[in-house]
């Protein structure tokens, strides 16, 4: 008998009543968070049999929720969301004992703080790598990038604005951190504006600790024809380079060559304070039949997966000497739900709480 190698979703029962904008896994892949235009977010836990169970669902903003991200578990179960209502909200899971049975534990998501200093729609947020502490970068439709830091990593209710950068004078759509411990931290910002200013759609900043500021790297010029919908640094860096993948119509892969002055010493101390020279090399163009929307690296940085506007998930694998080959291609239309899944989906829609009831949850 031939085995069924088709890929099937774990679960088709939805939690949202409107368009889902973001799906985010925690660093261990055991938990998942989703957010949507219905102003709600949901937390999912993976069961031992591989299925996903919805453990929480609540209204978290006063507008459409664009992003939801997880902090590293070292800082606790912390989730951040950003929204059309111009705010960023930090949530933390708290374990409490049931009043009926003291041995039984229940979890609640508590709103720790609301960051509301943005004057426009917040389009993306990203936590820093854990070796930098509990920090977060955000970008908005006015082209501003803000960097926040929690001075006490055990207190998620206090966040200070430490830097504000004007990346563009047009809309910012995505922001990401470099993950390397060996080099000075980098932040890459992408613009999804159709008419980019001077054709600049990607800006990269370098953190110079001795100067206590983020410096724009003007030597890195990306010639990209389409708006930037996503960009990510590879989790694995070479000694002399970073790798950056950019979704701009197709998926573009770049190596960013690092100068010796940007490489940290073994104890994490910088070389003499000076601006480093970076060189940009385009190593691959991963074609997409439709506009690439989101992209991710795997843990080893050897596979890039992207989702497209045609509902297709494509994956490419790196071989050697900067060669990439297509690994797989899956389309959501190829999956036909069973009658049991259809009935479960309809049942979930009729039994879900009303939005007015969701407002009272965890507030």
Curated annotation (Swiss-Prot):
The listed locations are: Nucleus, Nuclear pore complex; Lysosome membrane; Nucleus envelope
Q: Gene Ontology cellular component?
A: lysosomal membrane; nuclear pore outer ring; Seh1-associated complex
Name the Gene Ontology biological process terms. cellular response to amino acid starvation; mRNA transport; positive regulation of TORC1 signaling; protein transport
Name the phenotypic consequences of knocking out this gene: No visible phenotype.
Its keywords, alphabetically, are:
Lysosome, Membrane, mRNA transport, Nuclear pore complex, Nucleus, Protein transport, Repeat, Translocation, Transport, WD repeat
Q: Which SUPFAM superfamilies match?
A: WD40 repeat-like
The keyword Repeat is assigned to this record: yes
The record ties this protein, via Pfam families, to: WD40 (PF00400)
Describe its partners and assembly state: Component of the nuclear pore complex (NPC). Probably part of the GATOR complex.
Q: Which family does it belong to?
A: Belongs to the WD repeat SEC13 family.
Protein's name according to its UniProt entry: Nucleoporin SEH1
Q: Which gene holds the coding sequence for this protein? A: npp-18
């Amino acid at each position: 008998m031939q085995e069924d190698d088709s890929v099937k979703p774990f679960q088709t029962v939805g939690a949202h009543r409107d368009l889902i904008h973001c799906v985010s896994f925690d660093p261990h892949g055991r938990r998942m968070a989703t957010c949507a235009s219905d102003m709600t977010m949901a937390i999912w836990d993976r069961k031992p049999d591989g299925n996903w169970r919805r453990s929480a669902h609540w209204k978290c903003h006063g507008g459409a929720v664009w992003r939801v991200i997880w902090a590293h578990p070292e800082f606790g179960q912390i989730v951040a969301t950003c929204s059309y209502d111009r705010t960023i909200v930090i949530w933390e899971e708290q374990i409490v004992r049931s009043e009926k049975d003291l041995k039984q534990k229940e979890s609640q998501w508590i709103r720790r703080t609301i960051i509301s200093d943005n004057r426009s729609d917040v389009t993306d947020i990203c936590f820093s790598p854990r070796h930098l502490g509990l920090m977060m970068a955000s970008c908005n439709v006015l082209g501003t990038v803000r960097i926040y830091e929690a001075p006490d990593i055990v207190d998620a209710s206090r966040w200070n604005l430490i830097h504000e950068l004007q990346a563009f004078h047009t809309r910012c759509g995505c922001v990401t951190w470099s993950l390397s411990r060996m080099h000075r931290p980098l932040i890459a910002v992408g613009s999804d504006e159709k008419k980019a200013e001077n054709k600049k759609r990607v800006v990269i900043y370098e953190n110079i600790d001795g100067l206590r500021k983020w410096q724009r790297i003007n030597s890195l010029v990306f010639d990209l024809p389409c708006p930037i919908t996503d960009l990510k640094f590879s989790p694995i860096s070479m000694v002399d380079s970073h790798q950056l993948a950019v979704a701009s119509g197709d998926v573009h892969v770049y190596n960013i060559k690092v100068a010796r002055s940007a490489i940290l010493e073994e104890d994490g101390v910088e070389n003499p304070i000076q601006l480093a020279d970076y060189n940009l090399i385009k190593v691959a163009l991963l074609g997409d039949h439709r506009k690439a929307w989101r992209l991710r690296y795997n843990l080893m940085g050897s596979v890039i997966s992207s989702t497209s506007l045609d509902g297709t998930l494509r994956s490419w694998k790196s071989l050697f000497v900067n060669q990439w080959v297509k690994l797989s291609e899956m389309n959501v239309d190829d999956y036909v739900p069973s009658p049991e899944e259809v009935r479960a989906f309809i049942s979930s829609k009729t039994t879900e709480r009303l939005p007015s009831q969701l407002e009272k949850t965890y507030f």
